[in-house]
Amino acid sequence: MTGFGARLAEAKAHRGPLCLGIDPHPELLRAWDLPATADGLAAFCDICVAAFAGFAVVKPQVAFFEAYGAAGFAVLEGTMAALRANGVLVLADAKRGDIGSTMAAYAAAWAGDSPLAADAVTVSPFLGFGSLRPLLEVATANDRGVFVLAATSNPEGATIQRADADGRTVAQLIVDQVGLFNSEVGEVTGSEPGSVGVVVGATVLNPPDVSGLGGPVLVPGVGVQGGRPEALGGLGGAAPQQLLPAVSREVLRAGPSISEVRAAAERMLDSVAYLSAV
């Protein structure tokens, strides 16, 4: 299998540089006239799968599935399988983070051979970047991707992410460590794009420098959260092709009509299409 970095680059080139979120929170289920049950969750996801077929990347927010226990995880597994059957890359927004054998278990679940394993997964480096090593290694071995939280758009994040770490912010330290990992893997895989990226919010002021990352930058917060799609170019010194804007509510609030959700997604894709420029 080709590495995630190369698959992502190909998907963006052919389907556009946009990641669409599936965030089935109870308020949205009610707005779509669906019950806040596992059955309502499944119906919501069926609409999203139909609307998002043909797009590059879809990001299910795992927490909203966990809320329904085993039934929710079953819906998540089925949704991921249906998306991938349509050629869509699946990014599991799980934000996992731990140490040792526990992190190894997360690695097996989200980046190994489990039914939950996605094309890529989000992780938290709060326990130290080295704590992510088990998952990074499993993901690399299985040609999957990882997105490491670096500079998030929530105001509370700045307390830690902008703290000084030997002359650079914690966010910059994380970006630099990811860049080093991509360089190490690149010595083995050659010129293939890096498969480990970072998360930098669209509304972050003074974002970290990602020009040396060697991997993709997931940019959530576009749309309702205040990020302007036309203002993403050059974020953190990124090349246009590095950026992967992510949008959820701006598109999902157009539901429950499949055609309306798809039309909203296409409008957002049009607004970020300039990021595909070579």
Curated annotation (Swiss-Prot):
UniProt pathway annotation: Pyrimidine metabolism; UMP biosynthesis via de novo pathway; UMP from orotate: step 2/2
Active-site residues per Swiss-Prot or TrEMBL entry: 95
Pfam families cross-referenced by the UniProt entry: OMPdecase
Biological process per Gene Ontology, one example term: 'de novo' pyrimidine nucleobase biosynthetic process
UniProt-listed Enzyme Commission number(s): 4.1.1.23
Key words of the record: Decarboxylase, Lyase, Pyrimidine biosynthesis
GO MF assignments: orotidine-5'-phosphate decarboxylase activity
Catalytic activity: orotidine 5'-phosphate + H(+) = UMP + CO2
SUPFAM superfamilies: Ribulose-phoshate binding barrel (SSF51366)
Top-level EC class as recorded in UniProt: lyase
Presence of the UniProt keyword Lyase in the record: yes
Listed PROSITE patterns: OMPDECASE (PS00156)
Recorded family membership: Belongs to the OMP decarboxylase family. Type 2 subfamily.
Name the UniProt record assigns to this protein: Orotidine 5'-phosphate decarboxylase
Gene name linked to the record: pyrF
